[in-house]
Regions:
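Membrane-embedded beta-strand positions of outer-membrane beta-barrel proteins
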Residues: 9-15, 62-66, 107, 121-125, ...
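Outer-membrane beta-barrel "beta-signal"
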Residues: 12, 16, 147-148, 179-196
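Repeated loop/turn-to-beta-strand initiation elements of outer-membrane beta-barrel proteins
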Residues: 58-62, 117-121, 151-157, 163, ...
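Surface-exposed strand-loop-strand hairpins of Gram-negative outer-membrane beta-barrel proteins
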Residues: 18-47, 168
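Transmembrane beta-barrel domains of outer membrane proteins
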Residues: 49-55, 110-112, 144-148, 188-192
Length: 196
């Protein structure tokens, strides 16, 4: 029987937390106003997509997930040095807080090992195109664990780490000078429609 004759597929939805990782760099001297620092926090991290599973009944099987993410990232932009001294008190610039809508479109391919009847582990890669706030490509590495609750429901927990310096492309608008990687931890539910 060919691989393509042994395909299971269905809807996948997920929600989780994101970890934008701000890269460090050498700070310029005190008083250089080009030196802004950033703190990032995901307020919303969700996705929806479709999964194709090849060789679903075998000990080793493969998943191909096509997903679209919906993320809201809150960024705090602040100046790490004191600006002045007033009445013996050091005064810093007021921090700016702004929100950005981040939309990644991803095609994730993973190799999976079923080590019990219900549980499996997987590793893979996820080429990702961010279409918001700016168009930029990233390549994530992925690790995941899954639990098959029933014939028509599976839970999964996955972690993805973006290999490229994606944040440097999000510097239009109120941000400038930031750089770093994007990663997230996602809990998902897979609902197969077609079982082979």
């Amino acid at each position: 029987t060919s691989t393509f004759a042994q395909i299971e597929h269905g809807l996948i939805v997920g929600a989780g937390v994101g970890f934008p990782l701000q890269a460090r760099w050498n700070r310029p001297p005190w008083g250089d106003e080009s030196n802004w620092s950033y703190r990032h926090d995901y307020k919303l991290n969700s996705m929806i997509g479709y999964r194709f599973r090849f060789l679903p009944e075998q000990k080793f099987f493969y998943d191909l997930d096509i997903t679209m993410g919906f993320q809201k990232m809150e960024t705090t932009k602040y100046f790490p040095y004191y600006e002045s001294i007033e009445d013996g008190i050091y005064v810093s610039k007021k921090a700016d807080v702004f929100d950005e809508f981040v939309m990644p479109i991803s095609v994730a391919a993973s190799w999976n090992w079923r080590f019990t009847k219900k549980f499996h582990l997987g590793v893979g890669i996820a080429p990702t195109l961010y279409v918001q706030p700016q168009a930029v490509f990233d390549l994530s590495v992925m690790a995941k664990v899954g639990y098959r609750l029933s014939k028509h429901c599976e839970f999964g927990l996955s972690y993805q780490y973006g290999c490229f310096n994606t944040l440097k492309h999000f510097n239009n608008g109120p941000a400038n000078g930031r750089r770093g990687h994007l990663s997230d931890l996602m809990l998902s539910v897979y609902v197969p429609f077609v079982l082979k």
